[in-house]
A protein has these predicted regions:
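N-terminal hydrophobic/helix-forming segments and targeting peptides
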Residues: 1-257
Length: 257
């Protein structure tokens, strides 16, 4: 029973981590919280590091990668675990809007990673990532998660798509998300979410994500299903393994990038 409870708690932590990590930037932020809560010391790349034996440290780069390591009491080799912070998805291109037939707007996206395209149809989607904005105190980067059902990639009725079963999907044609009507303004949306004026958005790096939450299922609750299991299950597991490791003779490294 104790082992079952431990497994259940770990599963719940994993699914909460994935739900809170709709983009690689959010995933790295959440991993940093896990590390800091466990007493790991944050290091900055532009500072001189003074390391002590027996302590654990971490540093980040670009907001999309995090490297954690422990300094052994007696060095006897190293052990490394690594994973990706990103997941297969659609990335919004710089020319973000496509007007179709003068009546509605689609997002101009491109495939990112090894995607199973058919799974993206007819489900609520939203956007997450980061924006670089201009503020009174200078230029800064802000994380964004538009936490609502924002867009969808619709499939057409069967009588409008004869032969579709044999059709090879083209992400640049068949899988452009429907954003809104003719008045939809992507740049205004990003500015609103970032809390700045439209002209103060310098750039943005946004990705689509499915709105469904992860679930436990099966006759004995033996399975889990969730968006972004590739590769956040590994990113979470790598971090947990690093934090729970007790080997004091190895240089332990967890690299999530």
């Amino acid at each position: 029973m104790t082992e079952m409870l431990k497994t259940s708690e770990t599963t719940e932590k994993l699914l909460k981590f994935i739900d809170a990590s709709p983009s690689c930037f959010h995933a790295v932020k959440n991993i940093c919280v896990m590390l800091e809560d466990a007493g790991c010391i944050r290091l900055l790349e532009n500072e001189t590091w003074t390391l002590e034996k027996g302590k654990r440290y971490f540093t980040t780069r670009n907001g999309s990668s995090v490297l954690a390591f422990s300094v052994p009491e007696n060095y006897n080799g190293m052990q490394i675990v690594s994973a990706h912070s990103d997941s297969p998805t659609f990335r919004v291109k710089s020319g973000a809007e496509i007007t179709v037939e003068g009546h509605y707007k689609k997002l101009n996206t491109e495939g990112y990673g090894g995607m199973i395209l058919s799974t993206w149809f007819d489900r609520p989607l939203s956007l997450a990532g980061r924006a670089v904005v201009r503020t009174e105190s200078g230029v800064k980067s802000v994380l964004l998660n538009i936490d609502r059902d924002l867009c969808i990639i619709p499939s057409l009725a069967i009588h409008m798509t004869r032969g579709m079963a044999d059709h090879k999907l083209n992400p640049q044609v068949d899988l452009l998300p429907l954003l809104g009507g003719e008045n939809a303004d992507y740049n205004a949306l990003i500015a609103e979410e970032a809390g700045v004026k439209k002209e103060d958005v310098i750039s943005s790096d946004m990705f689509l994500y499915p709105r469904q939450h992860g679930v436990v299922f099966g006759m004995e609750n033996e399975f889990i299903a969730s968006p972004r299991l590739d590769d956040l299950q590994c990113a979470f597991s790598a971090t947990e393994a690093f934090l729970n490791a007790e080997n004091k003779e190895k240089l332990l490294i967890s690299a999530v990038f």
